[in-house]
C-alpha cells in the first residue's frame, strides 16, 4: 500500500524552520515526535495555514514523497509494452487535425499587421510568390518596434 503521508521527522523539520511555530514549540522543554500531540493543535493548524513558508514546505515535501513513490511504481514491464505498441501503431491519420501543420483553404482567417489585412496563404510550393510575401511580412514584423504604440499612449 502506498503511503503519501509525511513522516513525523519531516513535519518536525518543517516546524523547526518556521519561527511562529517555533514560538509555540518553545513552550516545551524538548520536542520529541510524541510531543507534537501535546501542542495546541488549533493554534498549530492556524499558524501553518497562515504561513506561506510552512505550506510551501509541506507541499514540497509531499511532492517529493509522491515523485519517489511514482519512481518506485514505474517498474511495470507490461505497461511499457502497451505504451510501445501504442506508439508503434500510431499513424499520421490518427493525429488530430489541429496538430497537423498545414494551412487549409477552409481555415482562412483575417490577420492584421499595422492595420493592413494579411490575406496571404502559404502554399507547399517554395518558389511561389506567397512564400516571398510571408517572408517579407515576417521581416517587417521582426523589424517593427512594438513599444512605439505603448510610448505614445
From Swiss-Prot:
**What are the alphabetically sorted keywords of the record?**
DNA replication, Early protein, Viral DNA replication
Q: Which residues form a coiled coil?
A: none
Work out whether the entry's keyword set contains Secreted: no
**Which GO terms are recorded in the biological process aspect for this UniProt protein?**
DNA replication; viral DNA genome replication
InterPro entries cross-referenced by the UniProt entry = Phage_Gp17
Keyword hit for DNA-binding = no
Q: What's the domain of life for this entry?
A: Viruses
Which is one Pfam family of this protein? Answer: Phage_Gp17
According to its UniProt record, which protein family does this protein belong to?
Belongs to the phi29likevirus protein p56 family.
Q: What does this protein do?
A: Involved in the replication of viral DNA. It is required at the very beginning of the virus amplification, conditions in which a low number of viral DNA molecules enter the host cell, possibly to recruit the limiting amount of initiation factors at the replication origins. Once the infection process is established and the other replication proteins reach optimal concentration, it becomes dispensable. Optimizes the binding of protein p6 at the viral DNA ends, thus favoring the initiation of replication.
Q: What is this protein called?
A: DNA replication protein 17
- Species in which this protein is naturally found: Bacillus phage phi15
Q: Which gene underlies this protein?
A: 17
